[in-house]
Regions:
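Extended, low-complexity, acidic/proline- and Ser/Thr-rich intrinsically disordered regions
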Residues: 4, 59-63, 131
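Hydrophobic, Leu/Ile/Phe/Ala-enriched alpha-helical segments that form helix-helix packing faces
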Residues: 6-18, 109, 113-116, 120
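Short amphipathic alpha-helical surface micro-motifs
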Residues: 4-7, 15-20, 66-70, 142
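Glycine-rich, aromatic-bearing surface loops/beta-hairpins
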Residues: 121-164
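A short, surface-exposed beta-strand/turn
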Residues: 50-84
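Non-catalytic accessory regions used for complex assembly or targeting
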Residues: 1-12, 30, 160-164
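N-terminal interaction modules that seed assembly of large macromolecular complexes
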Residues: 9-63
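Acidic, low-complexity intrinsically disordered segments
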Residues: 72-135
Length: 164
Protein backbone atom coordinates (compact mmCIF):
# COMPACT_ATOMS: atom_id res chain seq x y z
CA UNK A 1 0.00 0.00 0.00
CA UNK A 2 1.51 3.32 -1.02
CA UNK A 3 1.60 6.29 1.29
CA UNK A 4 0.43 9.71 0.24
CA UNK A 5 1.56 13.07 1.54
CA UNK A 6 -0.42 14.24 4.56
CA UNK A 7 0.60 17.81 3.71
CA UNK A 8 -1.00 17.64 0.26
CA UNK A 9 -4.10 15.94 1.61
CA UNK A 10 -4.59 18.51 4.38
CA UNK A 11 -4.03 21.37 1.95
CA UNK A 12 -6.66 20.05 -0.47
CA UNK A 13 -9.15 19.29 2.30
CA UNK A 14 -8.72 22.65 4.03
CA UNK A 15 -8.88 24.58 0.78
CA UNK A 16 -12.06 22.72 -0.15
CA UNK A 17 -13.74 23.88 3.06
CA UNK A 18 -13.70 27.50 1.90
CA UNK A 19 -12.94 28.38 5.48
CA UNK A 20 -13.82 31.92 6.53
CA UNK A 21 -10.69 32.56 8.61
CA UNK A 22 -7.10 33.05 7.38
CA UNK A 23 -5.05 29.88 7.63
CA UNK A 24 -1.58 28.70 6.77
CA UNK A 25 -0.23 25.18 6.30
CA UNK A 26 3.54 24.74 6.63
CA UNK A 27 6.07 21.94 6.83
CA UNK A 28 8.66 22.12 9.60
CA UNK A 29 11.79 20.31 8.42
CA UNK A 30 13.47 20.43 11.84
CA UNK A 31 10.76 18.46 13.57
CA UNK A 32 9.48 16.76 10.42
CA UNK A 33 6.01 17.99 11.22
CA UNK A 34 3.10 19.69 9.54
CA UNK A 35 1.65 22.81 11.12
CA UNK A 36 -1.79 24.26 10.41
CA UNK A 37 -2.37 27.71 11.87
CA UNK A 38 -5.80 29.30 11.80
CA UNK A 39 -6.29 32.94 12.79
CA UNK A 40 -9.66 33.99 14.20
CA UNK A 41 -10.20 37.76 14.40
CA UNK A 42 -10.86 39.31 17.79
CA UNK A 43 -13.43 42.06 17.74
CA UNK A 44 -11.97 43.95 20.72
CA UNK A 45 -8.64 44.41 22.40
CA UNK A 46 -8.20 41.40 24.67
CA UNK A 47 -6.50 41.31 28.02
CA UNK A 48 -2.87 40.30 27.64
CA UNK A 49 -3.09 36.81 26.19
CA UNK A 50 -0.13 34.92 24.73
CA UNK A 51 -2.40 33.39 22.06
CA UNK A 52 -3.25 36.74 20.48
CA UNK A 53 -1.24 37.51 17.37
CA UNK A 54 -1.32 40.08 14.62
CA UNK A 55 -1.79 39.27 10.94
CA UNK A 56 1.95 38.53 10.61
CA UNK A 57 1.73 35.99 13.46
CA UNK A 58 3.64 38.16 15.93
CA UNK A 59 2.45 38.55 19.50
CA UNK A 60 0.24 41.57 19.85
CA UNK A 61 -1.76 43.26 22.59
CA UNK A 62 -3.81 45.33 20.16
CA UNK A 63 -6.60 44.33 17.79
CA UNK A 64 -5.41 40.93 16.74
CA UNK A 65 -6.17 37.38 15.80
CA UNK A 66 -6.49 34.36 18.02
CA UNK A 67 -3.95 31.97 16.58
CA UNK A 68 -4.75 28.27 16.92
CA UNK A 69 -2.05 25.80 15.91
CA UNK A 70 -2.56 22.15 14.99
CA UNK A 71 0.71 20.17 14.73
CA UNK A 72 0.95 16.79 13.05
CA UNK A 73 4.22 15.01 13.79
CA UNK A 74 6.18 12.20 15.37
CA UNK A 75 4.49 12.28 18.76
CA UNK A 76 3.40 9.39 20.95
CA UNK A 77 0.00 10.85 21.88
CA UNK A 78 -2.26 13.85 21.37
CA UNK A 79 -1.39 16.67 23.77
CA UNK A 80 -1.96 20.38 24.26
CA UNK A 81 1.34 22.15 24.93
CA UNK A 82 -0.32 25.40 25.89
CA UNK A 83 -3.71 26.90 25.18
CA UNK A 84 -4.22 27.15 21.44
CA UNK A 85 -1.53 24.63 20.42
CA UNK A 86 -2.72 21.10 19.71
CA UNK A 87 -0.36 18.18 18.99
CA UNK A 88 -2.02 15.45 16.90
CA UNK A 89 -0.09 12.19 17.00
CA UNK A 90 -0.20 9.59 14.21
CA UNK A 91 -2.34 6.52 14.83
CA UNK A 92 0.21 4.23 13.13
CA UNK A 93 3.95 3.92 13.58
CA UNK A 94 6.56 5.84 11.60
CA UNK A 95 4.56 9.07 11.50
CA UNK A 96 1.75 7.58 9.43
CA UNK A 97 -1.92 8.47 9.71
CA UNK A 98 -4.79 6.48 8.22
CA UNK A 99 -7.28 8.34 6.04
CA UNK A 100 -10.18 7.61 8.36
CA UNK A 101 -8.25 8.87 11.36
CA UNK A 102 -7.36 12.08 9.52
CA UNK A 103 -11.07 12.57 8.73
CA UNK A 104 -11.89 12.25 12.44
CA UNK A 105 -9.13 14.74 13.32
CA UNK A 106 -10.41 17.21 10.70
CA UNK A 107 -13.93 16.93 12.10
CA UNK A 108 -12.75 17.76 15.62
CA UNK A 109 -10.39 20.49 14.40
CA UNK A 110 -13.38 22.24 12.80
CA UNK A 111 -15.33 21.73 16.05
CA UNK A 112 -12.48 23.27 18.07
CA UNK A 113 -12.36 26.26 15.72
CA UNK A 114 -16.13 26.78 16.02
CA UNK A 115 -15.77 26.64 19.83
CA UNK A 116 -12.95 29.20 19.71
CA UNK A 117 -14.99 31.52 17.49
CA UNK A 118 -17.99 31.21 19.82
CA UNK A 119 -15.84 31.91 22.88
CA UNK A 120 -14.34 34.98 21.19
CA UNK A 121 -17.83 36.29 20.48
CA UNK A 122 -18.81 35.72 24.12
CA UNK A 123 -15.60 37.46 25.23
CA UNK A 124 -16.41 40.44 23.01
CA UNK A 125 -19.93 40.67 24.45
CA UNK A 126 -18.56 40.54 28.00
CA UNK A 127 -20.19 37.16 28.70
CA UNK A 128 -16.81 35.49 29.24
CA UNK A 129 -13.54 36.61 30.79
CA UNK A 130 -11.15 33.96 29.45
CA UNK A 131 -10.86 31.45 26.66
CA UNK A 132 -11.05 27.75 27.50
CA UNK A 133 -9.68 25.86 24.52
CA UNK A 134 -8.81 22.20 24.88
CA UNK A 135 -8.47 19.32 22.44
CA UNK A 136 -11.46 16.92 22.68
CA UNK A 137 -9.40 13.75 23.35
CA UNK A 138 -12.34 11.69 24.56
CA UNK A 139 -14.61 12.75 21.69
CA UNK A 140 -11.94 11.72 19.16
CA UNK A 141 -11.53 8.35 20.87
CA UNK A 142 -15.31 7.78 20.95
CA UNK A 143 -15.69 8.85 17.31
CA UNK A 144 -13.04 6.33 16.20
CA UNK A 145 -14.63 3.58 18.33
CA UNK A 146 -18.09 4.33 16.97
CA UNK A 147 -16.88 4.27 13.37
CA UNK A 148 -15.11 0.96 13.99
CA UNK A 149 -18.27 -0.52 15.53
CA UNK A 150 -20.33 0.19 12.41
CA UNK A 151 -17.55 -0.78 9.96
CA UNK A 152 -17.06 2.81 8.78
CA UNK A 153 -13.44 2.86 9.80
CA UNK A 154 -11.09 1.08 7.45
CA UNK A 155 -7.38 1.68 7.12
CA UNK A 156 -7.34 1.98 3.34
CA UNK A 157 -5.44 5.20 2.75
CA UNK A 158 -2.19 6.02 4.53
CA UNK A 159 -0.71 9.49 4.85
CA UNK A 160 2.90 10.19 5.69
CA UNK A 161 4.47 13.29 7.24
CA UNK A 162 7.04 13.34 4.46
CA UNK A 163 6.57 15.94 1.75
CA UNK A 164 7.02 14.40 -1.69
Amino acid sequence: MTEKSLFEYLYQEWQGLRFQFPWQLTYDERSTGIILQVHLPSRQEPASDHMMRDALNKQSDQFAYLSLTFRFGYYSKDISLQPGIFILAPNLGNGTYTGDYVQVLLKWMRYTLRQADQQLRELDRGERETLDLTWPHEAVRQDVAQRQAVNRYGNKERYSLEVY
